[in-house]
Regions:
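C-terminal accessory subdomains/tails of enzymes that are appended
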Residues: 3-8, 124, 177-180, 184, ...
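Helical element adjacent to the flavin cofactor pocket in flavoenzyme catalytic cores
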Residues: 239-299
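N-terminal Rossmann-like FAD-binding beta1-loop-alpha1 element of flavoenzymes
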Residues: 93-120
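Extreme N-terminal leader/targeting segments of oxidoreductases
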Residues: 2-95, 113-114
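Glycine-rich active-site loop/strand segments that organize a redox cofactor
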Residues: 127-161
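Glycine-rich FAD pyrophosphate-binding loop
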Residues: 112-134
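A structural signal for short hydrophobic beta-strand segments in well-ordered beta-sheet cores
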Residues: 272-275, 356-357, 436
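Short hydrophobic core segments
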Residues: 97-98, 295-305
Length: 728
């Protein structure tokens, strides 16, 4: 056979193979497409069918799941903190929980509703640590599912499925604090369309009947219509999928209050001095601070997050540490940075991380980073991490939008409690999920995991307590579907009743309903008359935020003991806007001083501690670092003008502006952070440069300096610190 004939014989065979491959690929694609089409239609029908049932079931207590009396709306007021402490001192408990974050609170609620007498103590405030510093998402973990598919990892698949079940449960048991949020995944390369579409559809499929709503693809035009700030260049389209969002600190508190309503004794600002053991070396209680009284308990649960090892060392000084904390930084930007009802996911940042960009509490939260760190009671956000997040945001937003350092209203660092699994041979490998360790002395340690799965973690921890300490619960786990504080009589239009019945402003009523649920009426009854035709009641703490002075009084009933408890966790103001938090601080402290009978010394202490918290843990100090790094970019004329204004402020003629003088002028600003409380001329020049470059944006300082120079442009609108996106 000649060479030419052999080539002719080969060509039809090659074409046949190609046709078979194309037919096979088409067939597989058709089957997959048909499967997802059926799944979409089925899920959509189920969603439409169940949606109304969901809202009706939460509209009135009479129609909520009545399988257990535990789900009836509790009547009466909460016990006082003094009553809880007395009960803790006088009674003997089945379980003592150390740690008042999401997991510890979940353990207390689970154990108490099983009929086990439970106490909980927290060194600081409920949710004062990692649980209040999250990304505010209730999610299954899209990236974990991606890893499960790519690596055929069954363990990660089970993690995602478990988290998606818990996501649905949280949305059901606290609908006033949580809600579905559409998240956009913008696509800039054509090959990413089928890749991400398949991954997101798998996320829907794993959700099963717990799906929130089906994901879908939109083209470039619709993507820009929905998210106008998005970068237009090379945009192909976007995928929209759904996850949950919540108010994390308030959710944590709702779990604690629900445990207390069911009979648990939970106290914040109580530390464990040391653990008590019986003659057999088994734990039998703990010695607490304050009056140094012992709490007797048959079983002790260590749910202290990043501080896990400190309690483990109390039980066994020779134990090996297992916690390897990682710092995650988030920043808050003004609300105009994102649409009010759509988030954004950057699935692959410049260093391989994932960053979320989400609307939250009428602002925009962005994060997170992931950096190994040391354990700290007061973690501070690093300016380098803040700049990294801003850089990633710039890469996704329209080039016409100037993403400024001065627009960062708040920033915080949360310690993620990554742990090694002591139950495995390779004890240095990080556990992908949570771990439960039972020590020789019967200390039950629950560590790792994430916010979404707190309830499942708590269930497993209580199961371990029952087994290890031979406890006798009256029933099994009752927490799936157990309504949390404020959820029983909540329904989506409850805020209208507040407006009509009490004469409260609409945005304030929405805030009250979505923060306190059916307890919003209690807060409304505590409000004072405004003396105006409208609103009739409800005096705001700050004109730009819906928080009321009556909420400070109610926060005390919710066991707020310090000013930080109020501005950070009962209200979320320090997480949203540090400038506004400084401005309301005096009023908050005065209300608390009156209600709690603080001495003058205690009042001054509370003011100082709260200011330090805002400056150090909420990002003001990092802001000053960024200002000090600004290069001088002033002309000779601008430097002369700055010097004249500096001299006008320097009343003592000592070539420095002291924090006391500055505070008289600017209120509670952060000038005192520079040069150990003094602002020198060189630093004043840097401030001017920051104002010029956009590192610092319009605020009272700018207006005051303009007034000093007699150059105030009355035709130019002066924006409030909130609307301008920050300030010094």
């Amino acid at each position: 056979m000649s060479a030419s004939s052999s080539r002719k014989a080969f060509v039809p065979l090659s074409n046949a193979l190609r046709r078979r491959k194309l037919l096979f690929g088409f067939g597989v694609g058709t089957v997959i497409g048909a499967g997802f089409y059926y799944m979409d239609k089925n899920n959509e029908r189920r969603f439409k069918r169940d949606k109304d049932v969901y809202f009706v079931s939460n509209a009135h207590a009479a129609t909520v799941d009545t399988k257990t009396a535990l789900n009836k709306r509790p009547s009466g007021s909460l016990p006082t903190r003094a009553e809880l402490l007395k009960g803790m001192r006088d009674e003997e408990f089945d379980i003592l929980v150390i740690g008042g974050g999401a997991t510890g609170a979940g353990v207390a609620l689970d154990a108490q509703t099983r009929g086990l007498k439970t106490a909980l103590v927290e060194l600081d405030d409920f949710s004062s640590g990692t649980s209040s510093r999250s990304t505010k998402l209730i999610h299954g973990g899209v990236r974990y599912l991606q890893a499960a598919i790519m690596k055929f990892d069954r363990e990660q698949y089970k993690m995602v499925k478990e988290a998606l079940f818990e996501r649905a449960n949280l949305l059901e048991i606290a609908p006033h604090l949580s809600y579905p949020l559409p998240i956009m995944l913008p696509i800039y390369k054509l090959w990413q369309v089928p890749y991400y579409w398949f991954g997101i559809k798998m996320y829907d499929w794993v959700s099963g009947k717990r799906i929130l709503k089906n994901s879908y693809y939109i083209d470039k035009e619709k993507a820009l219509e929905r998210f106008p700030m998005l970068k237009k260049e090379s945009l192909k389209g976007a995928l929209i999928y759904y996850d949950g969002q919540h108010n994390d600190a308030r959710m944590n508190l709702a779990i604690v209050l629900s445990a207390i309503r069911n009979g648990a004794k939970c106290c914040n600002h109580v530390a464990v001095e040391h653990l008590l053991k019986d003659e057999n070396g088994k734990l039998c209680g703990a010695q607490l601070t304050g009056e140094l009284f012992p709490v007797r308990a048959k079983c002790i649960v260590n749910a202290t997050g990043p501080f896990t090892d400190s309690i483990r060392l109390m039980a066994d000084p020779d134990t090996e540490p297992i916690c390897r904390p990682s710092a995650g930084v988030h920043i808050v930007l003004p609300g105009y940075y994102s649409p009010a009802n759509t988030g954004l996911l950057d699935p692959s940042t410049t260093d391989g991380r994932v960053i979320f960009f989400l609307p939250w509490q009428r602002m925009t939260v962005a994060g997170t980073t992931d950096s190994p760190c040391d354990v700290s009671f007061s973690p501070k956000p690093r300016n380098s991490d803040i700049e990294f997040i801003l850089g990633e945001i710039r890469g996704y937003l329209n080039k016409d939008i100037s993403v400024r350092r001065g627009d960062v209203m708040s920033a915080w660092s949360g310690l993620r409690p990554l742990v090694n699994d002591p139950n495995k041979k390779d004890t240095k490998s990080l556990a992908r999920n949570h771990i439960i360790e039972v020590s020789k002395s019967n200390l039950i340690t629950i560590a790792g995991g994430k916010w979404t799965t707190y309830r499942h973690m708590a269930e497993e921890a209580v199961d371990a307590c029952v087994k290890a300490c031979n406890l006798k619960p009256k029933n099994g786990c009752m927490t799936p579907g157990l309504m949390l504080e404020g959820a029983h009589d909540w329904y989506p239009l409850l805020y209208i009743n507040l407006v009509q019945d009490y004469g409260i402003e609409v945005d304030v009523a929405q805030h009250l309903a979505n923060t306190y649920g059916d307890r919003a009426f209690v807060v409304a009854r505590m409000c004072k008359m405004t003396g105006k035709r409208w609103p009739i009641v409800g005096n705001r703490l700050h004109e730009e935020f819906p928080y009321l002075d009556a909420e400070v009084n109610y926060a005390i009933k919710e066991y707020a003991c310090t000013a930080v408890d109020v501005i950070a966790r009962r209200l979320r103001l320090s997480f949203l806007n540090t400038y506004a938090a400084h401005e309301v601080l005096n009023q908050v402290v005065m209300i608390m001083a009156r209600e709690l009978a603080w001495s003058r010394q205690e009042t001054e202490k509370q003011l100082k501690v709260a200011r330090d918290f805002i400056n150090n843990e909420m990002g003001q100090e990092a802001r000053m670092q960024s200002v000090s790094d600004v290069p001088l970019n002033l002309t000779k004329e601008e430097m002369q003008m700055a010097k004249e204004r500096f001299n006008q402020l320097d009343k003592d003629k000592k070539d420095t502006l002291r924090s006391m003088t500055s505070a008289d002028t600017f209120g509670s600003t952060t000038i005192k952070l520079m040069s150990n409380g003094e602002l020198e001329l060189a630093e004043f020049f840097q401030l001017y440069s920051g104002l010029k470059s956009g590192q610092i944006t319009q605020n009272r300082l700018v207006r005051y300096l303009d007034e000093l120079g007699g150059e105030k442009d009355k035709t130019k609108p002066v924006l409030d610190v909130v609307r301008s996106g920050g300030g010094f």
